[in-house]
């Protein structure tokens, strides 16, 4: 998707739809901002992390735009997984998580909260953002 860049050019696939460049740039800026802020405020005991869903979370917006068909779509991720990832990042010691840019199932699997995962950050063909690499 647009959140993860197209990789190194030149590009041969001219069928890619437009509109993702600004979205992807904003996501990249948010990831870099989060890491910079984490470094600046860690001395005050403040942790800053950034987490994205490994798969599309079924919401009225993602259903409307046909990214998923509904709550039971196998391409989608349960909102519970995002909630668990946020809980993990808030409850683990700051030294283990501050400055992390990660995906929900990636971090849950890494810390043993789930045994299986799928999607960005977990599947070998979907590594995610360069900032999220372990």
PLM region descriptions:
Residues 22-26, 63-65, 76-80:
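Short linear motifs at secondary-structure transitions and domain/linker junctions
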Residues 30-47, 76-88:
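Generic detector of contiguous secondary-structure segments
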Residues 46, 52-66:
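Short beta-loop-alpha junction of Rossmann-like oxidoreductase domains
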Residues 50-51, 67-134:
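C-terminal helical subdomain
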């Amino acid at each position: 998707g647009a959140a993860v860049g197209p990789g190194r050019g030149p590009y041969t696939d001219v069928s890619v739809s437009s509109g993702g460049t600004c979205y992807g740039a904003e996501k990249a800026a948010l990831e870099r901002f989060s890491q910079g802020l984490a470094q600046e405020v860690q001395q005050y005991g403040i942790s800053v992390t950034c987490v994205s869903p490994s798969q599309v979370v079924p919401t009225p917006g993602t259903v409307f735009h046909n990214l998923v068909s509904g709550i039971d779509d196998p391409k989608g991720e349960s909102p519970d997984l995002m909630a668990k990832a946020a809980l993990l990042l808030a409850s683990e010691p700051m030294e283990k998580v501050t400055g992390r840019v990660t995906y929900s199932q990636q971090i849950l699997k890494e810390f043993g909260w789930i045994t299986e995962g799928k999607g960005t950050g977990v599947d070998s063909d979907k590594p995610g953002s360069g900032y999220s690499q372990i």
